[in-house]
Amino acid sequence: MAQKYQAVKGMNDVLPAESYQWEYFEEALRKLLADYGYQNIRTPIVEGTPLFVRSIGEVTDIVEKEMYTFVDSLNGDSLTLRPEGTAGTLRAVVEHNLLYNATPKLWYMGPMYRHERPQKGRYRQFHQVGVEALGLAGPDIDAEIIAMTADLWRRLGISQYVRLEINSLGNAEERAAHREALIAYLERHVDILDEDGKRRMHTNPLRVLDTKNPALQEMANAAPKLSDYLGEESRAHYEGWKAMIAALGIEYIENPRLVRGLDYYNRSVFEWVTSELGAQGTICAGGRYDGLIEQLGGKAASGIGFGMGMERVLLLLQDKGLLPAQRSVDVFLVNQGEGAGLYSMKLAQTLRAAGYSVVQHLGEASFKSQMKKADGSGAEFALIVGENEIQAGQVVVKALRADVAQQTVAADAVLATLATLKA
């Protein structure tokens, strides 16, 4: 017996019984993004490894532990399956000069890859939708992005299950001053740090505060706060952002320990969090990355964006029973006898041209078997064609979901008959 193959651990198939749920969510996202003036960009799944090391940060979990990296056997280049979408999008912006006399607002959707321990809401292949708004330095675009995500939750019916947490990371100089104070603080508490904390203490001290280790929580809570090191300009930006969010009627929680796991963030950062999914509670996160475009070879320009975990949002929608029932076809065509198959095929094309979704039985099967399939398909109507109907130029119309007598009508009256029955 031939070997059976299985999907790679942590990388899941989306079967037809679930794919309609993805389509529903994707359609809602596309409508939202169009309403806010965002344009789609599609970048390769594979990028050169140095792009991610430069943008995400060398001393981050993603770069150190989670990237799927391999060597191109043809030229020896180090390549990586994208672990997030911002770096590749900005690489494309710089490469194709999209910032020339423009402030692009871009969105992407697709699979990302991280070598993590698979669990509910955390996978090795996962899907993100993300946005990047470029060339806009004020807090107004930061507020609009929050408004857009809040709008999505409202449209999906999950506003009551999510909360917004925000913080400001300041600029490079302010973070440097805070970093110096934080390292000094951590050095005084080095005896209680775990091995990961000791390793990061001098390379990425902010991430030490983002610990999930309960034994370190008290130490982290008492650490110097970045908010105490914000200068006038960063503080004004943060206060302006908060004022706009409040004016839009969006509730938020200030979280001084919200630092995000990617090194490119500065000033505004945020997370949308839910308590309904256990440990994997963050469903959308992002922030400002002024300076990153310049680091990737472009001109100096501001930027802000977010990434949304699509699987996690779908899990929340499923948990709350907010996904629609699977869409069924409008018409199932049953055919019996010589010539009925071709007759039905022509009729099916006419129906599809008029906007109906149609499944035609193909191959040999009894009338009883075909009617059973018609009922199981979820179709609203069965159209029945046999040799007698072909000779008379007629079709039998049977309603499958309503107590209506079946009727035999002329073939050219089928569309009008269906329209009447659906009214």
Curated annotation (Swiss-Prot):
Family named by the database record: Belongs to the class-II aminoacyl-tRNA synthetase family.
Enzyme Commission number, as recorded: 6.1.1.21
* Gene3D superfamilies recorded: Anticodon-binding domain (3.40.50.800), Bira Bifunctional Protein, Domain 2 (3.30.930.10)
Q: What is this protein called?
A: Histidine--tRNA ligase
**Which compartments is it annotated to reside in?**
Cytoplasm
- What reaction does this catalyse? tRNA(His) + L-histidine + ATP = L-histidyl-tRNA(His) + AMP + diphosphate + H(+)
GO biological process, any: histidyl-tRNA aminoacylation
Q: Which enzyme type, at the first EC level?
A: ligase
Reading the lineage from the top rank, the first entry is: Bacteria
Q: Which PANTHER family match?
A: HISTIDINE--TRNA LIGASE, MITOCHONDRIAL-RELATED, HISTIDYL-TRNA SYNTHETASE
Please spell out the taxonomic lineage of the organism that makes this protein: Bacteria, Pseudomonadati, Pseudomonadota, Betaproteobacteria, Neisseriales
Assembly notes = Homodimer.
HAMAP family membership: His_tRNA_synth (MF_00127)
Mainly localized where? cytoplasm
> Which keywords does this Swiss-Prot/TrEMBL entry list?
Aminoacyl-tRNA synthetase, ATP-binding, Cytoplasm, Ligase, Nucleotide-binding, Protein biosynthesis
- Give an example GO molecular function: ATP binding
GO CC terms = cytoplasm
Name the InterPro entries on file.
aa-tRNA-synth_II, aa-tRNA-synth_II/BPL/LPL, Anticodon-bd, Anticodon-bd_dom_sf, His-tRNA-ligase, HisRS-like_core, HisRS/HisZ, HisRS_anticodon
In terms of PROSITE patterns, this protein maps to:
AA_TRNA_LIGASE_II (PS50862)
